[in-house]
Amino acid sequence: MEFLVDMVTTVPEGTSSETVEDTKRREAARTKELTAQGHLLRLWKPPEAPGEWRTFGLFNATDEDELRQVLASMPLHEWMTVTVTPFTPHPSDPGIGRPAG
């Protein structure tokens, strides 16, 4: 099942720049792992307001419980506000039956 995840990250006031950079490095590494595992399909950066740190992700998981576990494994998760929208295939989806890639 696919899910659109809106992730807004807010770094707690007083967090050192070293902690932020380390967490971002670990997040990038975890993103690669989730991609290799087939959980993370796409990422997008929408236009942001000043000071906003926002990402949209397309994730694949068996169900919402598994998705929540996947999201909790991301190093930035404790700083994120997450909104999840589950997707089901549309009968007119041009991608149905088309080979991936």
Which functions belong to the PLM regions below?
Residues 1-101:
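Conserved, structured core segments of small domains
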